[in-house]
Amino acid sequence: QWLITQHGRVALPDPSSTQGRVVRRAIGVDDGTHTWPVPPELLNAFAELPPLNFPAQPPEVVDTGQGLWARTPDGVAELTPTQAQMLIGLGAKTAASTAQEIAALADVPLNLNLPSTTFRFVSPDEGWMCAGNEGGGVVVPAQAGTVALAGEAVAHRFGGLNTGGVGVDSGHGYHVVAPTGQRHEVKDKETLEALGTGVGARVPWEILRLLPEGSALSREQALQVSS
């Protein structure tokens, strides 16, 4: 399972493991949380974030009444309530201290990478899950006027082009995307310029490849598709 946020995706620990249960409880996953089925092609459109990482030995979790800290023999590092909950769930001992006592200790980096907050998880009732241009997850309201995609494609529906096609630079080549949602490879940027579309959009290949592939177009064929 993966956690997809506005920043990208990160793998969650095995749900049957202690770490997996601790992480899910802390970030707000429960029996009512919807799990989205995501094919590998769409999953790869989300930016992969650094993996979650717990310290080999849980540090002591210290509460000053003004903040939470992880304390080791070398010093302290600030924690969020969510991170503290995870560490305690893995057996970290707790202690009370004062802000003055913590201020006297050195700041040290911790060998951990854990979510800093809980999340509000969305369901299909709230819209469609999409991958944004920067690799983050986006939920957009279901939109009227979309068309079902023909042929073999990971994406199911397409919208946004009422009339005419658009020239697209994927970073791996140039395409014309037709109003039907099919993508057609063209030879070069000059072909798009000759069509009058130019590069109307820059779309990462990881997203563009989710559309059904049409035949490669010559300049004459591309003129027909974009008209």
Segments and roles (model prediction):
Residues 1-227:
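Short, surface-exposed polybasic-aromatic patches that bind anionic ligands, especially phosphate groups
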